[in-house]
């Protein structure tokens, strides 16, 4: 890794994470993405929108969003029409993969300034009428839920990801109680971080017009953390396997809206513009295995990222492992031997939310905040994705 050109993160920003059909549901994925990009660039003194040469942005449920959501995000944020834009779909890892692609673009000398991240408005995901083009000639027609079809269903087995989370719980011996207690802890960490203002620096508030003459509303916080009710969480019925199941709605991540962006620069541009770096990208790794085992793919990607970075696992001060389900974090901690005291210290996706195309970038943005708050130096973000994959990234806080 030391032989490759350096890539620096000079800023990061994210929207609040909105609940499904909640406070941010009036905004499209490109509008959310544009807000995150604009906020990230506004943090960098000496860098103009016209300096950005390329944008990589994750988005998963792109039906009805319009052509190339990344391009819409870029132009909506005021970037030049000459900015090259690419939308990335690696399911839940899209946002982190976009950042990896941005770093690679700089390292290969194709750009000096890249914006990367991800966006998703699950509230605005449409339903499909797949047979309408050839005609509904006779009988009932069914709507297909775009969220379920393109976001939450294994394309090979045609089964919900939640059933594969159940498979993970069985494979690795995690009970319903263990998953519930983990979910409660992650909610409590998110609530504590929210109360202490630890998300304030990473969140770019969104002002929304008031309804029917009412005053404008400014959304400043993630919506989900306040919803914790431990008694209800422990009592709710399983979501995927009636009776004997261990995975429930509240010990899984919810459906959400949100976006996150980071600004990446080369060392030459950093020095030329006298920019202040936030962090340095040290390495990354991608991995894949049997699609139904997507839950534990981070346990393959994280070691690859650490090796690429030339960093030992014990040297990492904080990990972000995306909580698609509570059991995902539990299983990967177990497989890698990572203590929970180092993982998702400000809460994870179960409590904060999981706007799928954005989450990879969101966990990196939060990781930078965790390292700053805990006075840590090295951090690693890992996230699984549908189809059996995962992506991971290692950073050094500067």
Curated annotation (Swiss-Prot):
GO annotation, biological process: ergosterol biosynthetic process
Protein name: Acetyl-CoA acetyltransferase erg10B, cytosolic
Other remarks in the entry: Even though it is not involved in catalysis directly, the Cl(-) anion stabilizes the catalytic site via both direct and water-mediated hydrogen bonds to catalytic residues and residues adjacent.
MF-aspect GO terms: acetyl-CoA C-acetyltransferase activity; metal ion binding
Span of the signal peptide: none
Inhibition and activation profile: Activity is increased by monovalent cations such as K(+), Rb(+) or Cs(+).
Gene name tied to this protein: erg10B
Pathway note: Metabolic intermediate biosynthesis; (R)-mevalonate biosynthesis; (R)-mevalonate from acetyl-CoA: step 1/3
InterPro entries registered for this protein in UniProt: Thiolase, Thiolase-like, Thiolase_acyl_enz_int_AS, Thiolase_C, Thiolase_CS, Thiolase_N
């Amino acid at each position: 890794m030391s032989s490759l050109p350096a890539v620096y993160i000079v800023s990061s920003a994210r929207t609040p994470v909105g609940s499904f059909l909640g406070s941010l549901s009036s905004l499209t994925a490109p509008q959310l993405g544009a807000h995150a990009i604009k906020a990230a660039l506004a943090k960098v003194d000496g860098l103009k929108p016209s300096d950005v040469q390329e944008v990589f942005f994750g988005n998963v449920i792109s039906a009805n969003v319009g052509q190339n959501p990344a391009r819409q995000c870029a132009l909506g944020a005021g970037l030049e029409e000459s900015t090259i834009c690419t939308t990335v779909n690696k399911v839940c890892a899209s946002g982190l993969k976009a950042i990896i692609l941005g770093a690679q673009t700089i390292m290969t000398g194709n750009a000096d300034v890249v914006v990367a991240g991800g966006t998703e408005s699950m509230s605005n995901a449409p339903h499909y009428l797949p047979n309408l083009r050839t005609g509904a000639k006779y009988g009932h027609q069914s709507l297909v839920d775009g969220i379920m079809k393109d976001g939450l269903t294994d394309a090979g087995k045609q089964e919900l990801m939640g059933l594969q989370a159940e498979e993970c719980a069985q494979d690795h011996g995690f009970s319903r109680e263990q998953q519930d207690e983990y979910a409660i802890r992650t909610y409590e960490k998110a609530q504590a971080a929210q109360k202490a203002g630890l998300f304030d620096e990473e969140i770019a508030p969104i002002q929304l017009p008031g309804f029917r003459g009412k005053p404008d509303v400014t959304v400043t916080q993630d919506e989900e953390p306040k919803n914790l009710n431990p008694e209800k969480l422990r009592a709710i019925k399983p979501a995927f396997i009636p009776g004997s199941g261990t995975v429930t709605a509240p010990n899984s991540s919810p459906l959400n809206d949100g976006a996150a962006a980071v600004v990446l620069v080369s060392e030459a541009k950093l020095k030329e513009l006298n920019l202040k770096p936030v962090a340095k990208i040290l390495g990354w790794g991608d991995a894949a295995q049997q699609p139904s085992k997507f839950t534990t793919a981070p346990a393959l990607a994280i070691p690859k990222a650490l090796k690429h970075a030339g960093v030992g696992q014990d040297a990492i001060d904080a990990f972000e492992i995306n909580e698609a389900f509570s059991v995902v974090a539990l299983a990967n901690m177990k497989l890698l031997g990572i203590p929970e005291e180092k993982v998702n210290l400000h809460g994870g996706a179960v409590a904060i939310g999981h706007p799928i195309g954005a989450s990879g970038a969101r966990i990196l943005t939060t990781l930078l905040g965790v390292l700053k708050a805990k006075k840590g130096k090295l951090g690693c973000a890992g996230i699984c994705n549908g189809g059996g994959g995962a992506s991971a990234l290692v950073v050094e806080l500067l």
